[in-house]
Amino acid sequence: MALSREDVLNAIAEMSVMDIVELISEMEEKFGVTAAAAVAAAPAAAAAGAAAAEEKDEFDVILASFGDKKVGVIKAVREATGLGLKEAKELVEGAPAPIKEGANKVEAEELKKKLEEAGATVELK
């Protein structure tokens, strides 16, 4: 008498975790397959994508908007970039605009913090 799929699933459902692990190992040996390969492929790909995002070492600091404290933001931009008053004002008024390109993570975070303290909305890309 052949077992139906439902019978097999019911039998597996009644097994302990250790018995299921042993069953999987025996099935891998008997049929020459690996159960973990298909399951691990998706998380590995996701982890690789996450690792690539974490490893980004150059950031562009983008001034999204200057909010209601335009003068303070202009001063912060001048201090950060060394631009003159006119150039900094044009840069701020032209938001969204890049403030610094290719900055390392620490430098980009510090610049973002300074600009946000001055009232700006800043993005790191």
Curated annotation (Swiss-Prot):
Q: Which InterPro entries does this one have?
A: Ribosomal_bL12 (IPR000206), Ribosomal_bL12_C (IPR013823), Ribosomal_bL12_C/ClpS-like (IPR014719), Ribosomal_bL12_oligo (IPR008932), Ribosomal_bL12_oligo_N_sf (IPR036235)
**Which UniProt key words apply to this protein?**
Ribonucleoprotein, Ribosomal protein
Would you say which domain of life the source belongs to?
Bacteria
Q: Which Gene Ontology CC terms are recorded?
A: cytosolic large ribosomal subunit
Q: What would you give as a GO molecular function for this chain, any one?
A: mRNA binding
Q: Which GO terms describe its biological process?
A: translation
Pfam families, A to Z:
Ribosomal_L12, Ribosomal_L12_N
Kindly state the subunit structure of this protein.
Homodimer. Part of the ribosomal stalk of the 50S ribosomal subunit. Forms a multimeric L10(L12)X complex, where L10 forms an elongated spine to which 2 to 4 L12 dimers bind in a sequential fashion. Binds GTP-bound translation factors.
| Cited function | Forms part of the ribosomal stalk which helps the ribosome interact with GTP-bound translation factors. Is thus essential for accurate translation.
The entry assigns this protein to a family as follows:
Belongs to the bacterial ribosomal protein bL12 family.
State the name under which the record lists this protein.
Large ribosomal subunit protein bL12
Instruction: Tell me what organism the protein belongs to.
Output: Psychrobacter sp. (strain PRwf-1)
The lineage, from the top, is: Bacteria, Pseudomonadati, Pseudomonadota, Gammaproteobacteria, Moraxellales
